[in-house]
Amino acid sequence: DNTFSPLSVTPVNLGADVVIHSLTKYINGSSDTVGGVVCGTQEFINDLKNVNNGACMLLGSTMDSFRSASILKNMRTLHLRMKQHSFNAMYLANAFEALDIKTVYPGLKSHPSHEIFKTMFNEEFGFGGMLTIDVGSLEKANAVMELMQEKNLGYLAVSLGFYKTLFSAPGTSTSSEIPLDEQKEMGLSDGLIRFSIGLDND
């Protein structure tokens, strides 16, 4: 699943036989379309499309032409957008870390997989637009997110890849169905804020 890192990582070059993307996220980039894509060999795709036993029979309807055209149009700027998402995320990751806020971003040398990621990513497109900070408690996380909304610095949303910065507290949103003891084992704290960094030029 390369939804979080189109262009930044090319899984086929790393040995992947099948790559999937959510077109809803970075590839479309405007949060107005729902879709996905499966990439593989022609033989694999033909098997998926087989009307008798192909898995695509389970994946939903065919996208309408207007949405398809919208995604194709937005793909023309994907290379520019991914560079800016990555640039902004790197800037903010450095700023958060300089403030002694626990920051998780693969572009930081402090990230445990930084050196591994450097061997996999396409330098031209950076380390991607997703980062996480831990401010210590849910109360602080909520205060940060409320302040960001007041200052019009982004939107509270669990999506990603939008041109505007999106943020959410995983413990009370995307990970809320995971029991608290399992969240702790996974390193998820109440103070986590997940950011999908936008295209802002300031």
Predicted regions and their residues:
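Short, acidic Gly/Pro/Ser/Thr-rich loop/turn segments
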Residues: I45-N46, L78, L138-A141, T174-S175, ...
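Active-site beta-loop-alpha junctions enriched in small/polar residues
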Residues: T3-S5, L108, G198-D200
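Short glycine-rich loop/turn motifs that provide flexible caps or phosphate-binding loops at active sites
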Residues: N28, V34-G35, L59, L160, ...
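Conserved PLP-enzyme active-site core in the AAT-like
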Residues: D1-V104
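Short amphipathic alpha-helical segments with coiled-coil-like heptad repeat character
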Residues: Y91-A98, N152-Y155, D202
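Hydrophobic/aromatic-rich, well-ordered segments within soluble, folded domains that form packed cores
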Residues: L80, Q84-Y91, M186-N201
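Conserved C-terminal alpha-helix-loop-beta "cap" of PLP-dependent enzymes
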Residues: K102-I193
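Short, well-ordered beta-strand elements within core beta-sheets of diverse protein domains
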Residues: I71-L80, G128-G136, R194-G198
